[in-house]
Regions:
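Membrane-interface helix-boundary motifs at transmembrane edges
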Residues: 6-7, 122-130
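N-terminal signal-anchor transmembrane alpha helix
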Residues: 10-40
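Small-polar-interrupted transmembrane alpha-helices in polytopic inner-membrane proteins
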Residues: 19-27, 112-116, 131-154
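Membrane-interface capping segments at transmembrane-helix boundaries
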Residues: 213-224
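Cytosolic juxtamembrane amphipathic/interface segments immediately preceding
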Residues: 1-9
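Extracytosolic (periplasmic/ER-lumenal) interhelical loops and adjacent juxtamembrane/interface segments
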Residues: 35-102, 159-188
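Hydrophobic cores of alpha-helical transmembrane segments in multi-pass inner/ER membrane proteins
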Residues: 111-116, 198-214
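Membrane-interface loop-to-helix entry segments
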Residues: 99-111, 194-202
């Protein structure tokens, strides 16, 4: 037992990243299980991750179907609801495919944090210092702003009533409506889709290159 504990302590980053990759990768198994007809197992994973993600289908990726993402109008044709709580229980259909148990923002943030951790390990753990805390907070800020404005818009207008983060009229005005198909909605290719993807990536980079070097330094002090 002592030998095992010593091994874990010596290779703590490898163990931590392995566990993180399993935990963050498990939501990709839910659409696989649903497609195989193992609906109880797939539904269990969706339920397991509900506390960590809203799982709104119009803001999620679908696998094994016609498209990667669907608009709320497309979803409402087979699942007529505008209630956010009810919408999270739409997992997909054989034709549409099955959604990943992460929303697009959480998919980007949660999944890429251990991936950036692997990059940190590959670049040489001992040589890299933690990001300055101001830069770390700056990396989190875009995702926080994006998420907070979506929450505010959804609370005021609902998820289907043309809120300011659904239409993004403000962005169309700022850019002279140069890209008409880019502004409204949450589906692939829209501003919201890219904003969630890239702010999640930036936050994941910040967390990985702040937390993992800091934990490494802490471990070295303990070993000294």
């Amino acid at each position: 037992m002592d030998r095992f504990a010593a091994t874990v302590e010596r290779h703590w980053l490898a163990w931590l990243l392995a566990m993180m990759l399993i935990v963050t990768g498990l939501p990709f198994l839910s659409p696989v299980l649903m497609a195989l007809g193992w609906t109880n197992a797939g539904t269990f994973i969706y339920t397991l991750y509900t506390p960590f993600c809203h799982q709104l289908p119009q803001r999620s990726w679908f696998l094994f179907g016609e498209k990667l993402t669907y608009t709320l109008d497309e979803i409402n044709r087979v699942y007529p609801s505008s209630d956010p709580w009810q919408l999270r229980f739409f997992y997909g259909t054989q034709a549409m495919g099955w959604k990943v148990a992460w929303s697009d923002r959480m998919l980007s943030f949660y999944t890429m944090t251990p991936v950036f951790g692997l990059l940190y390990a590959a670049l040489g753990r001992g040589r890299l210092r933690p990001l300055p805390w101001r830069l770390f907070l700056l990396a989190l800020l875009p995702m926080a702003l994006d998420g907070a404005t979506h929450i505010l818009s959804d609370l005021i207008f609902g998820v289907s009533n043309g809120g300011f983060r659904d239409t993004n009229v403000w962005l169309a005005l700022l850019t002279g409506n140069a890209f008409p198909a880019f502004y409204a909605g949450d589906h692939f290719g829209t501003f919201n889709w890219y904003a969630r993807l890239f702010t999640g990536l930036l936050a994941a980079w910040g967390v990985a290159f702040f937390a993992f070097p800091w934990l490494d330094q802490l471990q070295r002090r303990r070993d000294a």
